Amino acid sequence: MPVPKKKTSKARSRRRYAVWLGKAKLQAQRAMTIGRAILSGRNTGFYYPKAKSEEDEEE
């Protein structure tokens, strides 16, 4: 089983953590933007199957 030979430096660890946090923030921002677009009705690139109403079920 491979084992790291040296301890990872604090600078490298913090840099990796900062990159990870940046990616997480970007994903959160995208999710909020998409959510806002859906709620405000500005979404054009999404496909939603229409909910079946009671009239459609009777046919």
From Swiss-Prot:
Entry keyword NAD: no
Entry keyword annotation includes Ribonucleoprotein: yes
GO cellular component: large ribosomal subunit
A biological process term (GO) from this entry: translation
Keyword line: Ribonucleoprotein, Ribosomal protein
Pfam family, one: Ribosomal_L32p
GO molecular function, one term: structural constituent of ribosome
Signal sequence, renumbered to the chain: none
Superkingdom, natural source: Bacteria
Family: Belongs to the bacterial ribosomal protein bL32 family.
Name of the protein: Large ribosomal subunit protein bL32
Gene source species: Synechococcus sp. (strain JA-2-3B'a(2-13)) (Cyanobacteria bacterium Yellowstone B-Prime)
Gene this chain is encoded by: rpmF
